[in-house]
Amino acid sequence: DEVAEIAQRYADNMASITVKSTDATHPQNGMSFGDLGETDLMEIGAGQHGEGGGVRVPMMSSKETVATVADALCKKLELKAGDQTFVMVNGCGATTTMEMLVLFKDTVEFLKAKDIEVVASMVGEILTVQEAGGFQLNIAKWDDEFIRLWKAPCHTPAYSKA
């Protein structure tokens, strides 16, 4: 019950948006999952596995993209100056570590300008789709209990930290 309560409280205080720049491919036949194709467009609000439904816009810089999506997440979470957050940048499959780190830096700078503190973070390929270009930005409003739990050691088959 305690774990379910904490997980629900986390879900209630977290928001995410996926930005897709290239389509995923099927692992058996290499065919594209989507219809974005080779364009100069990106899709904001696409499903993590290439599902459509987002809005297609001309490709933007990292700073412009982060400003667009982080602003939407901040509004959804009703973040304000002094709030503490967890930020996760998840690559969609074909996004390089360098690209994810640039996106993370731009996210931290965006939040810092609003006096919103990033107290913990994760950057990497956590949930991916074969050859999909893009990223998922997750922001969660955290309290002291979430921070304490994050700092605790964790050892599981899928994730470990000391």
Predicted feature residues:
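C-terminal non-catalytic interaction/assembly regions of soluble proteins
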Residues: 72-162
